[in-house]
Swiss-Prot record:
PANTHER family: EXODEOXYRIBONUCLEASE 7 SMALL SUBUNIT
The entry's keywords: Cytoplasm, Exonuclease, Hydrolase, Nuclease
Intracellular or extracellular location(s): Cytoplasm
Known EC number: 3.1.11.6
Top-level taxon: Bacteria
InterPro entries in the cross-refs: Exonuc_VII_S, Exonuc_VII_ssu_sf
Catalytic activity reported: Exonucleolytic cleavage in either 5'- to 3'- or 3'- to 5'-direction to yield nucleoside 5'-phosphates
Protein name as catalogued: Exodeoxyribonuclease 7 small subunit
Length: 75
């Protein structure tokens, strides 16, 4: 999964959720799908955390120049 892209992992996670919600999997199949889903969810979460750390916002100063500031999400 190290070379996998976020979008690919997210699509796989969405498919796993659809299969689990469908209710047609056996218990063993459900557990395997759940384990795979947890791996994809963890990967996606890590990628989102990395992206958030990289986001910078340009702020205009009073003198008209710009400065780069780390992204601070509103919580």
């Amino acid at each position: 999964m190290a070379t996998e892209k976020f979008e690919t992992a997210l699509k796989k996670l969405e498919e796993i959720v659809r299969r689990l919600e469908g209710g047609s999997l056996s218990l063993d199949e459900s557990l395997k799908a759940f384990e795979e889903g947890v791996r994809h969810a963890s990967f996606c979460s890590k990628k989102l955390d990395e992206a958030e750390r990289r986001v910078e916002v340009l702020l205009k100063r009073k003198d008209g120049s710009f400065s780069r500031e780390p992204f601070q999400p509103d919580e």
